[in-house]
Amino acid sequence: MAKMIPSLVSLILIGLVAIASAAVIFEERFDDGWENRWVKSEWKKDDNTAGEWKHTAGNWSGDANDKGIQTSEDYRFYAISAEFPEFSNKDKTLVFQFSVKHEQKLDCGGGYMKLLSGDVDQKKFGGDTPYSIMFGPDICGYSTKKVHAILTYNEANHLIKKDVPCETDQLTHVYTFILRPDATYSILIDNVEKQTGSLYSDWDLLPPKKIKDPSAKKPEDWDEQEYISDPEDKKPDGYDDIPKEIPDTDSKKPEDWDDEEDGEWTAPTIPNPEYMGEWKPKQIKNPNYKGKWEAPLIDNPDFKDDPELYVFPKLKYVGLELWQVKSGSLFDNVLICDDPDYAKKLADETWGKLKDAEKAAFDEAEKKNEEEESKDAPAESDAEDEPEDDEGGDDSDSESKAEETKSVDSEETSEKDATAHDEL
């Protein structure tokens, strides 16, 4: 037992050293002084559509002192960024993580963040500013509820080809993107892996390694017909003599039928139960079937591997650039590092520690809202006691027309919102 104790101590020390050696490139918890580290962009200020950020813990939280930054104005563009020492992830794991809470029942707006490279004029940072990585949730209507993972390669933005659903409730969630030197990646939500794979297969960063041989031709004797008619199956004798319809033997000539005036009476016809339709031989498996022919794959002459496909050599800024129809998205605990374990630890210490208390605060807020709404709603007895007269009817018609107008305006606004979102 005594011999085991030093070994156990050694393992603990090794673990502590590993954590201590984790390189934290950028970590922001939005405590006091955060405004000195972040630059608010002047993008969209000239046309008065730039939104203001609010430093707050939100309307419900697990800790009122644990604040982030929140969008505060509807129908606004938001842009803010922070600089960190230039960093390359060559031969290192890149971890990009942050938390976001959509308090506003978000129906159209982004919740993603960006990593930028090179030199950027932060005062002009906006939708047209080139970025290296864009990652995080995006919601717009019923069709878009996903996690973006967009990588820039050779000055082109490439979207992930896999679908990664995002969270859509009004609570805080942690989004993590991990990019490794072996060109593999993982996407986590609340410390749970939701997607993983390779840069080679899940983005179209490079031409495919293999392509179909354009010179290949299908052999003339290649049989793609899976089923054939049974040559042993023969049509029964007299099959074609079976009529499709037969006289209805149960029908009787009407008593008032006059052959001289009405003509000779004939019984109506009914479908013949013995009629089987056009005869066709039964189908059997084709013994010569070879399957659907496909051209063989060959090496793509246009493919050139890039061993540094995963590398972003001059990462220098992290930013938020959003369009929001309804404001209320709150961002916090932004992390850029090279150690997934440290990122998990940070998420556990922040989101994990407070999520139950936040859920309780949210439930309490919802309960209060329901109580307030029930107080404002007219009692049924009061509604029944109200006199019904012509003037009341006119008012009702006016209110109905007003509501119809609001509905039309709302539909038109939703269409405009979706259009603005798609243009981002």
Curated annotation (Swiss-Prot):
Protein name: Calreticulin-2
Keyword Metal-binding listed: yes
InterPro entries: Calret/calnex (IPR001580), Calret/calnex_CS (IPR018124), Calreticulin (IPR009169), Calreticulin/calnexin_P_dom_sf (IPR009033), ConA-like_dom_sf (IPR013320)
Note on domains (UniProt): Can be divided into a N-terminal globular domain, a proline-rich P-domain forming an elongated arm-like structure and a C-terminal acidic domain. The P-domain binds one molecule of calcium with high affinity, whereas the acidic C-domain binds multiple calcium ions with low affinity. The interaction with glycans occurs through a binding site in the globular lectin domain.
A biological-process GO annotation: protein folding
Role description: Molecular calcium-binding chaperone promoting folding, oligomeric assembly and quality control in the ER via the calreticulin/calnexin cycle. This lectin may interact transiently with almost all of the monoglucosylated glycoproteins that are synthesized in the ER.
Glycan attachment positions: 59
Residue positions, PTM Phosphoserine: 381, 396
Disulfide bonds: 108-140
Signal peptide per UniProt: 1-22
Sequence repeat residues: 194-205, 213-224, 230-241, 248-259, 263-273, 277-287, 291-301
Annotated compartments: Endoplasmic reticulum lumen
Acidic residues composition-biased segments: 221-230, 379-397
Keyword list, A-Z: Calcium, Chaperone, Disulfide bond, Endoplasmic reticulum, Glycoprotein, Lectin, Metal-binding, Phosphoprotein, Repeat, Signal, Zinc
Gene Ontology terms for molecular function: calcium ion binding; carbohydrate binding; unfolded protein binding
GO cellular component: endoplasmic reticulum; endoplasmic reticulum lumen; extracellular region; mitochondrion; plant-type vacuole; secretory vesicle
Stated family: Belongs to the calreticulin family.
Basic and acidic residues: bias regions: 210-220, 231-255, 362-378, 398-424
Positions of region (Disordered): 210-279, 362-424
Positions of region (3 X approximate repeats): 263-301
Binding of an alpha-D-glucoside, residues: 112, 114, 131, 138, 321
Region entry 4 X approximate repeats, spans: 194-259
Primary location class: endoplasmic reticulum
Motif (Prevents secretion from ER): 421-424
